[in-house]
Structures are given as structure tokens and as C-alpha cells.
């Protein structure tokens, strides 16, 4: 968790108090290294952010200042159902998640030099936790709809299935219905909002065309000879970074 690096009470406290100074020292030190191009982090604990908003806001500002654009903080809510939350000892509820997402959106929506918002939250759900029911999926969708109505940007919604002993069976019908609703109602619309027509993304690395993957040796002049150009179609590429956007271009 990015926000608990050298935090106060990591062992003793349920919600350790974030310490902005060492995080700022680390990230600014990394950013000052000219050898470093892309700098991203990953997980953030939304409950800790919500319970310590003042310190977390200072850290968020540091992240926006130092990270490359397109950075994502993965928030593991896992479930918006209070019953699932209680039965599985989850450490973040929907209220805390909303507070954390609002803070990240407040500072992270600004676009960087490559064309993407500087820092956005990602949201994780897990299916198959104990206490889950059809009500659970309804509460998850309700939360997502509220976040959308409130105008928050979410970079991606990740839906996983729990593995291991001691968990209940997943209702396949409910799970597929929830997953399809998320893909149709949120994934596409959120990307369209984040990347409206006319958005320019710089530094895209083209990786694949017609089922063929681009390799380092293909950067040489012998691979650029016009006489060996492939057939027309869609060429796919991505920017370097965490959770990069897949870009397709006619070529």
C-alpha cells in the first residue's frame, strides 16, 4: 500500500497514519534520476486514505507531482455488501471507498504530457466471498452507479473470483450478469469520458499486427524496408506503464 510506506502504527493500528515526508523524499528522489522515464505506483488502501484525509491529501499531491501520467491506484473494496464485509473481515467499506475516490479525483484528473489523467483510482471486486448473494451484486452495481452519477473517473473495474478452500460457490448466473453490466454500463462509458474523440496519446509503442508481435529486432532498419511491409489492418500498441490503454490504429 503506497500510503502506508513508513506510516505510524503499521502493526498496532487498524488504520495506520500515513507519513507524507518519507514518501515525498522517495518519489522526488526517484523523479530526479534522469535515467528514469516512467514512474508508476500501484495499490492504495482506501480505508486508510479515508480515515486520514489530511495526510493522504498531501501524499496524493506528491503522487500527482512525481508520477508519470496514466498512473492508477488500485482500490480493493472487494464487495459493497456489509454482510460480506463483516463475514470476511474486509478492511474497507463503501463509504470509505467513496471518500478515497473523491480525493484522488480532486487532484488526479489533470492531464499529463502523454495525454492521460495524472492519477486515477482503479476498483477491485471479488466474487465468491462468504455471505455473498444476489443482493451483493446489486449493491456493487448501486455503488458503481452512484460513483458514475457523482462524476468520478475510475480508470478500470477489475472483477476476480476467489480461490482457495473455505469459500462458497459462485452463482454463475449472478456473476455473469454482474460482469456484463459492469462492462456495458461502466467500462466503455468511463473510457469514452476519459478519452473523448480528439484525445492525443503520445509515446505509444506499437506491439502487434495481424497476430504478429513486434519484437526488439524489428526496430532495426532491415525491418523498416518498404518492400516487406505487411497487409493493411489494425496495429495495436500501448504506452509504457501500469494498466496501459490498448490503442488500435488503421495500418
Positions of the model-derived regions?
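Conserved SAM/AdoMet-binding glycine-rich loop
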Residues: 1-122, 127-132
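Auxiliary Fe-S-binding modules of radical SAM enzymes
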Residues: 32-37, 108-111, 115-116, 138-141, ...
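Short aromatic-enriched loop/helix-cap "lid" or pocket-rim segments at secondary-structure transitions
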Residues: 10-11, 53, 135-137, 169-173
Amino acid at each position: 500500500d503506497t500510503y502506508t510506506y513508513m506510516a505510524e502504527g503499521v502493526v498496532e493500528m487498524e488504520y495506520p497514519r500515513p507519513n507524507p515526508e518519507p514518501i515525498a523524499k522517495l518519489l522526488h528522489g526517484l523523479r530526479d534520476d534522469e535515467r528514469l522515464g516512467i514512474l508508476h505506483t500501484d495499490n492504495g488502501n482506501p480505508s486508510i486514505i479515508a480515515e486520514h484525509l489530511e495526510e493522504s491529501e498531501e501524499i496524493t499531491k506528491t503522487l500527482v507531482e512525481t508520477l508519470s501520467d496514466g498512473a492508477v491506484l488500485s482500490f480493493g473494496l472487494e464487495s459493497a455488501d456489509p454482510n460480506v464485509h463483516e463475514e470476511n473481515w474486509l478492511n474497507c467499506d463503501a463509504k470509505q471507498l467513496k471518500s478515497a475516490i473523491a480525493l484522488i479525483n480532486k487532484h488526479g484528473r489533470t492531464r499529463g504530457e502523454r495525454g492521460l489523467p495524472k492519477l486515477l483510482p482503479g476498483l477491485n471486486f471479488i466474487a465468491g466471498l462468504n455471505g455473498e448473494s444476489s443482493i451483493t451484486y446489486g449493491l456493487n452495481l448501486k455503488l458503481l452507479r452512484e460513483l458514475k452519477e457523482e462524476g468520478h473517473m475510475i480508470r478500470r473495474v477489475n472483477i476476480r473470483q476467489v480461490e482457495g478452500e473455505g469459500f462458497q460457490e459462485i452463482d454463475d448466473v449472478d456473476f455473469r450478469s454482474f460482469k456484463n453490466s459492469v462492462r456495458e454500463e461502466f467500462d466503455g462509458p468511463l473510457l469514452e469520458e476519459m478519452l473523448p474523440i480528439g484525445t492525443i496519446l503520445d509515446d505509444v509503442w506499437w506491439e502487434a499486427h495481424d497476430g504478429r508481435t513486434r519484437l526488439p529486432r524489428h526496430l532495426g532498419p532491415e525491418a523498416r524496408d518498404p518492400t516487406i511491409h505487411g497487409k493493411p489492418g489494425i496495429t495495436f500498441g500501448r504506452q509504457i506503464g501500469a494498466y496501459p490503454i490498448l490503442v488500435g490504429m488503421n495500418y
